[in-house]
């Protein structure tokens, strides 16, 4: 979204697993992950930080390198979203609230379509419904 806000002009965009808070509060979300990484090993079982740390242990080779990426994460002002008029698919798992509300994000974009698929933030990426939602939407653009 930051590239779109800075003037990138693709024919269309797909935002998967993203909600309104993740876009307009992106910098805050980045700070949350930095805090989680810096406190690794100390989070009580069952907390969001513990779950995120467990995922990170399985998928990230160098957590400290991720901190540098997260420090560059920026928020996008809500009013900027209203200027992004390209066709956009917002697709998200039915149980995914990780980055806020995907339907609210779709409503904030003037030319967006919302598609709900089964799953949560990480589980929905393994569902064939994600690929099918993107294929169907892209086919409808032609």
Kindly give the residue locations of the regions a language model identified.
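A short acidic, amphipathic alpha-helical/loop segment
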Residues: 2, 79-80, 101-104
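Catalytic active-site module of serine/aspartate enzymes centered on a nucleophile-bearing elbow/loop
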Residues: 112-142
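Proline-centered loop/turn at the N-terminus of a beta-strand
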Residues: 12, 87-89, 113
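Hydrophobic, aromatic-rich cap/lid helix
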Residues: 53-76
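Short beta-strand/loop motif that positions the catalytic acidic residue
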Residues: 83-84, 90-92
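Short, conserved loop/helix-junction motifs that constitute active-site signature segments
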Residues: 80-85, 107-109
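Conserved loop-alpha-helix segment in the C-terminal half of the alpha/beta-hydrolase fold
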Residues: 94-120
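Flexible "cap/lid" loop of the alpha/beta hydrolase fold
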Residues: 1-40
């Amino acid at each position: 979204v930051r590239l779109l806000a800075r003037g990138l002009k693709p024919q269309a965009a797909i935002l998967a697993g993203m909600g309104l808070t993740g876009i307009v509060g992106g910098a805050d979300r980045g700070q949350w992950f930095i805090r989680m990484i810096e406190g690794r090993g100390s989070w009580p079982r069952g907390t969001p930080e513990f779950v995120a740390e467990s995922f990170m242990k399985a998928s990230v080779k160098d957590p400290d390198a991720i901190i540098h990426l997260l420090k560059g994460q920026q928020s996008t002002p809500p009013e900027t979203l209203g200027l992004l008029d390209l066709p956009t698919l917002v697709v998200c798992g039915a149980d995914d609230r990780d980055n806020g509300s995907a339907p609210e994000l779709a409503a904030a974009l003037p030319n967006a379509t919302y598609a709900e698929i089964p799953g949560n933030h990480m589980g929905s990426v393994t569902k064939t419904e994600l690929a099918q939602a993107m294929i169907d939407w892209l086919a409808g653009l032609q």
